[in-house]
């Protein structure tokens, strides 16, 4: 059963709330129970008008929007769209807002179909969460124009040419800082080693020879480090002063890494100034503290992730796979305790065995389960070798289980990044009807290069083709559909 012909006039005045048509009292029940036929590329679906009117802001729920696709000759709505996807679209109206992607429809095609039918954003966000997708959060920008320009320069390198130049300078300074951090540990450059100190730096107190530490301010590595810190501090302050939200700024992990990259220098500087008035034993203690603090400088390498898409994808993959990684560590912990205990009791009768205790066997169990096998500890008895074989096999199986999930997450983030890059390069022509506003009904066939269905019923319907699916003004996302 199809809708009556008077629906053409009635639908222009039927504007529905969320779950009820605004029908007249006399014929409300009759109109709300009317059935409508929807033709999707030759496959007909039949439903009630009140089912579609549950979501009046969507394409099918708004009578004026769907009127553009009404075929008065066949008394149906025609959409040249993907047919398998419409099962889920119609179920969205029937279930009151539930979206379930068909198994034979890819994610990109189903996302295009939801966009075409103007499904509500809240339902799309819930669908993305159910599919395990990360919802893109709109980037906040400062209200002040000058702050906005500074924020774009230092936070988004792809925004302009000067921003790319600043990113190149920042990456260069990071690389120089990491190289200096590594070179200063070479024996020929380590001035804090007593063998390399000149005689003038040795003095004797109460028969004990003390080594006077060279002046840090004359160290060329310290000078280069100072120049790098000047740039890091300038970059950090500019980004902090121009950020749109100060609390959100400190919650960002990358900004915490920036603080860790800058703080060791100032702590080192403070300890160096304090050491000049301390005794020799206190200097040795300060030197030990200083070495621990300098170790934090290695975290500067993570500053490169701000300018590297690959490191960002890796970080997103690890964050999305945190539950799988936790499960992997838990399984490894169980295996380490189990096999270290087994190998200890298997090797207990051998006096030359290196497994003196169960905690001492933890190291062997870890390197065996991870298939590293250093060989510094190995079983010598038959029982110990059997336990070692089982430990290696169990380690391979334990590590292999969560790997496909982690690889799947990496592929998702990698392909999403590639799609975002393609979106910025290519232009898009959709494969369905033009998604114009419902108020555009004037004759624009010459400018839009389209043919509209003739209202003259004497013409042959086969010669009046409606080509409303061509839109040269949208952007191509690199995605294909099967319609």
Curated annotation (Swiss-Prot):
The keyword Phosphoprotein applies. Residues 440-459 are annotated as: Disordered. GO terms for cellular component: axon; juxtaparanode region of axon; paranode region of axon; perikaryon; voltage-gated potassium channel complex. The modification Phosphothreonine is found at residue 430. Gene3D superfamilies: 1.10.287.70, Potassium Channel Kv1.1, Chain A (3.30.710.10), Voltage-gated potassium channels. Chain C (1.20.120.350). A motif (PDZ-binding) lies at residues 481-483. A motif (Selectivity filter) lies at residues 371-376. Pfam families: BTB_2, Ion_trans. Residues 1-165, 242-252, 346-353, 407-483 are cytoplasmic. It is a multi-pass membrane protein. Residues 187-220, 274-324, 375-385 are extracellular. Residues 440-452 have a biased composition (Polar residues). GO terms for biological process: action potential; magnesium ion homeostasis; potassium ion transmembrane transport; protein homooligomerization; regulation of membrane potential. Keywords: Ion channel, Ion transport, Lipoprotein, Membrane, Palmitate, Phosphoprotein, Potassium, Potassium channel, Potassium transport, Transmembrane, Transmembrane helix, Transport, Voltage-gated channel. A lipid is attached at residue 243 (S-palmitoyl cysteine). The chain crosses the membrane at residues 166-186, 221-241, 253-273, 325-345, 354-374, 386-406. Belongs to the potassium channel family. A (Shaker) (TC 1.A.1.2) subfamily. Mediates the voltage-dependent potassium ion permeability of excitable membranes. Assuming opened or closed conformations in response to the voltage difference across the membrane, the protein forms a potassium-selective channel through which potassium ions may pass in accordance with their electrochemical gradient. This is Shaker-related potassium channel tsha2.
């Amino acid at each position: 059963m199809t809708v009556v012909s008077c629906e053409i006039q009635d639908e222009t005045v039927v504007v529905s709330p969320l779950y009820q048509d605004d029908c007249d009292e006399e014929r409300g029940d009759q109109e709300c129970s009317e059935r409508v036929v929807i033709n999707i590329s030759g496959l007909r679906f039949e439903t009630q008008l009140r089912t579609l009117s549950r979501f009046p802001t969507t394409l099918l729920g708004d009578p004026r929007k769907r009127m553009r696709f009404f075929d008065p000759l066949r008394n149906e709505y025609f959409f040249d769209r993907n047919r398998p996807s419409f099962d889920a679209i119609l179920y969205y109206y029937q279930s009151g807002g539930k979206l379930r992607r068909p198994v034979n429809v890819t994610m990109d095609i189903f996302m295009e179909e939801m966009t075409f039918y103007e499904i509500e954003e809240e339902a799309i966000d819930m669908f993305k969460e159910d599919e395990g997708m990360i919802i893109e959060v709109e980037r906040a920008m400062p209200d002040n124009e000058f702050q906005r320009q500074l924020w774009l320069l230092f936070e988004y390198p792809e925004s302009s040419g000067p921003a790319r130049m600043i990113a190149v300078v920042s990456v260069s300074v990071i690389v120089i800082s990491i190289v200096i951090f590594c070179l200063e540990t070479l024996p020929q450059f380590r001035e804090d080693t007593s063998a390399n100190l000149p005689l003038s730096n040795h003095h004797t107190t109460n028969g004990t020879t003390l080594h006077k530490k060279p002046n840090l301010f004359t160290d060329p590595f310290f000078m280069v480090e100072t120049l790098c810190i000047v740039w890091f501090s300038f970059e950090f302050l500019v980004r902090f002063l121009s950020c749109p939200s100060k609390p959100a700024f400190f919650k960002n992990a990358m900004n915490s890494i920036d603080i860790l990259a800058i703080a060791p220098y100032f702590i080192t500087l403070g300890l160096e100034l304090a050491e000049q008035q301390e005794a020799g034993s206190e200097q040795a203690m300060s030197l030990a503290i200083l070495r621990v603090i300098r170790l934090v400088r290695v975290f500067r390498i993570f500053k490169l992730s701000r300018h590297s898409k690959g490191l960002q994808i890796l970080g997103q993959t690890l964050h999305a796979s945190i539950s799988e990684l936790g499960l992997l560590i838990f399984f490894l912990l169980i295996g380490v305790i189990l096999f270290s205990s087994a190998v200890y009791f298997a090797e207990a009768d051998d006096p030359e065995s290196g497994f003196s205790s169960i905690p001492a066997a933890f190291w062997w169990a870890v390197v065996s389960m991870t298939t590293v096998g250093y060989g510094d500890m190995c079983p010598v008895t038959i029982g110990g070798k059997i336990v070692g074989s089982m430990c290696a096999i169990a380690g391979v199986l334990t590590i292999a289980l969560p790997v496909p999930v982690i690889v799947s997450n990496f592929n998702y983030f990698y392909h999403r990044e590639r799609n975002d890059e393609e979106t910025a390069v290519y232009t898009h022509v959709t494969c369905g009807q033009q998604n114009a506003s419902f108020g555009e009904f004037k004759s624009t066939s010459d400018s839009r290069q389209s043919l509209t269905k003739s209202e003259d019923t004497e013409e042959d319907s086969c010669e009046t083709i409606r080509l409303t699916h061509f839109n040269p003004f949208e952007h191509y996302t690199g995605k294909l559909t099967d319609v």
